[in-house]
């Protein structure tokens, strides 16, 4: 097992990474749990891992109840959030009841937002079961639900008490979900660590085969990079925005196609290539770097191009992006592979040229 600590102005917390951790969850998480816990999961994850977690909490003497939600990005909304609140209130959850998010990024984001707002703040723990959530969404305290006009538009910064990433849970992931998570892994190398990017180029077949040693190394490095960035910029006033590489274009794809039609990681993959193409238009990164990024994404089974839709729709979706400031769109681009840069775009003709093959 590998452990690292996230340090933020609000508080610090551990991330546990390894195999076979879920059966040990009671003992590992006991210092971060109250006397009672609410396990919140979905219909897909519950049959796989809920029983194991319940047994682990029983062994640690932690009482608990469970709330099981529908699965999928299409349910990341007010209606499903209210199901969490219904379950908490029906089970008389108190402010010190610990909410445990058992699932992927959708569960983690919604449970975190529920924790941030239930009785004005209850503790919560992340137990991510997808690659995307283990390397990205479970760490750093971003919580949210979607709005029909934009992804993650309603939310809060609210840090968990702990994160437990059991890599064994990745063996039950569908291949498409594994690839989607790998988009975020590749993103880290592209935005801030060319050495890691090169390592990914060399080890992608082993990673996709879930070989234990390289997988542990990759998840640890991603969490380490995110922890370092979040420690410097908890509420995304500066460099934390780098972590949104590919997301401005990607969120537009998700909103246009309908949440869940393209998986988040698939949309981010296409978005990363578009961000590199935009950087080319601005005279920053090279066509060779863009091609190299696209090739690595494709090696992970990911799309390197977005679906086709009208430029006006791209602009409409991107105008709702959370990085827009003073009406000016801000994109995360690349000076070169391994070096992200925040770019303000006032000339939409540059965006049109970037997107021209997909209009």
UniProtKB/Swiss-Prot annotation:
CC cofactor note: Binds 1 divalent metal cation per subunit. Can use either Co(2+) or Zn(2+).
InterPro entries: Dehydroquinate_synthase, DHQ_synth_AroB, DHQ_synth_fam, DHQS/DOIS_N, DHQS_C
Biological process per Gene Ontology, one example term: amino acid biosynthetic process
Pathway the protein contributes to: Metabolic intermediate biosynthesis; chorismate biosynthesis; chorismate from D-erythrose 4-phosphate and phosphoenolpyruvate: step 2/7
Transmembrane segments: none
Keyword hit for Repeat: no
Biological source species: Neisseria gonorrhoeae (strain ATCC 700825 / FA 1090)
Descriptive protein name: 3-dehydroquinate synthase
GO cellular component assignments: cytoplasm
E.C. no: 4.2.3.4
Transferase found in the keyword field: no
Binding site for Zn(2+): 184, 247, 264
GO-annotated molecular function: 3-dehydroquinate synthase activity; metal ion binding; nucleotide binding
